[in-house]
């Protein structure tokens, strides 16, 4: 990175954070520092940043909220405090996958707005800016007291996989919440056919069902777009409906892939032919999931972000 100020990449805890920090360091031309992480006998987290970092005026901490998310959160807070203690003036959290964002409001009485509490904690710990890749709802970044960046990955992912949007392609949001993603992807790729499915979720049991649809998939190759695949239930439901209603095939784009339990088996049984996701969470061996390196995309946008801090 050009300029008089010196920035450093600080790798976070976990395999996804390690991979992403190495990619950012390579793409941004910045030094990478790898802290020491360990647990005390009572399982309290401990971190130490080795080496002299006092000469750096800024740091980009790469910490994805991989499981358990609470551990990722605590390590991100401890790293920020360690950097402040070392005299680093400006600190950016690059969270490839930002946790706690799905509890963005009170669904049942007595619940917290979890993402608000987390954003406040991160800002209080010393972070001046926060960047992530396709957060669940972009407005949750407003809870963070500082500069924010939400990186849209889907156009880049399609390009990297060599898939184009032809006349027989339809882009589908598995629920109305993902419609803005689909609209933007359609706009940037020139895809004229898109829409969304309407799902209903039982807040107690978590059971999901499709209520209706705004798309006609007959004779189309469907691209389903969502921010995250967790248990695979939503994607499986969408794929099954699309194929039953005449779609030729179902291809999935997801920014993040947790793949909990039998998610892959569930999607395969529902007819999903391929899933393309980002390297924001730990990679899993898979028959249908392909990972796209998003560090090149993130590097360019982070360079602009830090230049304005």
Curated annotation (Swiss-Prot):
GO cellular component: cytoplasm; ribose phosphate diphosphokinase complex
Biological function: Involved in the biosynthesis of the central metabolite phospho-alpha-D-ribosyl-1-pyrophosphate (PRPP) via the transfer of pyrophosphoryl group from ATP to 1-hydroxyl of ribose-5-phosphate (Rib-5-P).
Cofactor remark: Binds 2 Mg(2+) ions per subunit.
GO molecular function ontology, one term from the record: ATP binding
Binding residue positions for D-ribose 5-phosphate: 201, 226, 230-234
Phylogenetic lineage: Archaea, Thermoproteota, Thermoprotei, Desulfurococcales, Desulfurococcaceae
Protein EC: 2.7.6.1
Binding residues annotated for Mg(2+) 2, in chain numbering: 175
Source organism, top-level taxon: Archaea
Family: Belongs to the ribose-phosphate pyrophosphokinase family. Class III (archaeal) subfamily.
Subcellular location: Cytoplasm
This protein's name: Ribose-phosphate pyrophosphokinase
């Amino acid at each position: 990175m050009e300029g008089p100020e010196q920035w450093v990449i600080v790798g976070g805890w976990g395999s996804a954070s390690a991979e992403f920090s190495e990619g950012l360091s390579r793409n941004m031309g910045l030094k990478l520092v790898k802290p020491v992480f360990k647990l005390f006998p009572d399982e309290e987290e401990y971190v130490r940043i080795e080496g002299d970092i006092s000469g750096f005026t800024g740091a980009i901490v790469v910490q994805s909220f991989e499981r358990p998310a609470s551990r990722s959160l605590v390590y991100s807070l401890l790293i920020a405090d360690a950097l402040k203690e070392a005299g680093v003036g400006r600190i950016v959290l690059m969270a490839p996958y930002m946790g706690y964002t799905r509890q963005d409001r009170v669904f049942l009485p007595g619940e917290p707005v979890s993402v608000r509490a987390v954003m406040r904690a991160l800002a209080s710990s010393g972070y001046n800016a926060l960047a992530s890749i396709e957060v669940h709802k972009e407005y949750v970044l407003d809870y963070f007291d500082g500069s924010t960046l939400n990186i849209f990955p889907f156009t880049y992912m399609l390009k990297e996989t060599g898939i184009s949007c032809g006349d027989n392609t339809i882009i589908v949001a598995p629920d109305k919440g993902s419609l803005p993603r689909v609209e933007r992807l359609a706009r940037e790729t020139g895809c004229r056919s898109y829409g969304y499915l309407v799902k209903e979720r039982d807040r107690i049991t978590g059971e999901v069902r499709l209520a209706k649809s705004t798309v006609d998939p007959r004779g189309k190759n469907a691209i389903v777009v969502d921010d995250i695949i967790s248990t695979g239930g939503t994607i499986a439901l969408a794929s099954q409906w699309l194929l039953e209603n005449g779609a030729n095939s179902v291809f999935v784009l997801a920014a993040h892939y947790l793949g909990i339990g039998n998610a892959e088996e569930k999607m395969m049984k529902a007819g999903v032919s391929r899933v393309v996701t980002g390297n924001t969470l730990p990679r899993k061996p898979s028959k249908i999931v392909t990972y796209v390196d998003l560090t090149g995309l993130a590097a360019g946008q982070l360079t602009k972000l830090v230049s304005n801090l």
